[in-house]
A protein has these predicted regions:
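Bacterial N-terminal signal peptides that target proteins for export
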Residues: 1-10
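Short, aromatic- and cysteine-enriched interfacial helices/patches
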Residues: 6, 31-32, 296-298
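Bacterial N-terminal signal peptides
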Residues: 10-20
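Short aromatic-glycine motifs in intrinsically disordered, low-complexity regions
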Residues: 53-66, 214-224
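Extracytoplasmic/lumenal ectodomains and periplasmic regions of secretory and membrane proteins
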Residues: 185-249
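C-terminal single-pass membrane-anchor helix
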Residues: 248-304
């Protein structure tokens, strides 16, 4: 399988800027135009997904997911296969992976072009008393300055610009859900990182996706369905927090938006975006793409 996963990675990297995380599965024509051979495609089509629907228990975080209509849930092993073998993410990026949601018109791994990655961070109870006091415009300006500063140490072609909020951060106080999206601009195009955080008493469930800017409206239309699909078990919801017994997190809502724990919350690196560490976001997408191509094509030449 590993040989074909490498081929898949080459295809995805080569075609990514043409079909950036679209909700439409890759067609045979798309894959042929990206360089996959008819023989390889035939074999890769045999690597079918086993998606689940209905209510699925997420025992690792004492929660469950009711799979939204129009989607399939891929369990942790299949999610790792997609994210690591097919999309060439480092395995260490997904220590807390629960699964992924993919559109239900996908049949095999290679044709999946977008996924909502679900992870859990056992970081403790995050207080939301700063929800109404955060100036997100000021936060954006700070982050943009950090991007500019970081770009100074990167080659011009590898630089990334934080254009702004695609979806302004907003917190649903009644359901304890934090949502935002930001647009990142690379020399080859733009991507949108879409983030949803569902808070519980012991930590948070994160739903993340990297999407085409043109598909943001579609994600927004599914936003409520996505977050409502996750529910914590009795005794583990946000309202069940007991200060005498439960751990309080050092994180704040503002810290989550700033990117303090992005390294733990499953941001996809499908497009060459590396997982981000600590609060200072470092975007090196072009470097990842170039390195991935060199590694994959280098491996191919060696085998030949």
């Amino acid at each position: 399988m590993r040989n074909f996963s490498l081929s898949a990675s080459i295809i995805l990297i080569a075609s990514v800027w043409l079909m950036l995380c679209s909700f439409t599965p890759y067609s045979d024509a798309d894959l042929f135009s990206a360089g996959v051979s008819e023989e390889d495609l035939k074999t890769l089509k045999e690597d079918v997904i086993e998606g689940q629907t209905g209510v699925i228990m997420l025992s690792a975080c004492h929660a469950q997911i009711e799979v939204p209509e129009g989607f399939l849930f891929l369990d942790e092993p299949q999610a790792r296969k997609l994210l690591i073998d097919y999309w060439d993410n480092p395995e260490s990026n997904f220590d807390d992976l629960l699964g992924v949601l993919v559109p239900d018109d996908n049949e095999y791994f290679l044709q999946i072009s977008v996924a909502f990655v679900i992870t859990y961070d056992n970081c403790g109870y995050i207080k939301d008393n700063d929800a109404n006091s955060i100036d997100y415009n000021e936060l954006l300006e700070t982050l943009q300055k950090d991007f500019e500063e970081n770009n100074k140490s990167l080659p011009e072609g590898n630089r990334c610009k934080l254009k702004g909020w695609t979806v302004t951060p907003h917190y649903d106080q009644s359901n304890h859900v934090l949502i935002w999206a930001k647009t990142l601009e690379f020399s080859s195009g733009e991507v949108v990182n879409y983030d949803m955080r569902i808070l519980g008493k012991d930590g948070l469930v994160s739903i993340n996706a990297v999407v085409n800017p043109e598909d943001v409206d579609e994600v927004v239309s599914k936003e409520s369905t996505m977050v409502q699909s996750i529910s914590f078990d009795k005794g583990y919801a946000y309202a069940d927090f007991n200060p005498a017994r439960d751990k309080v997190s050092d994180w704040t809502l503002g810290g989550l938006v700033a990117g303090s724990i992005l390294a733990k919350t499953g941001v996809l690196s499908k497009l060459g975006l590396l997982l981000l560490k600590f609060w200072k976001i470092i975007a090196v997408g072009a470097v990842g793409i170039v390195a991935g191509l060199k590694k994959l094509f280098g491996s191919k030449k060696t085998k030949e």
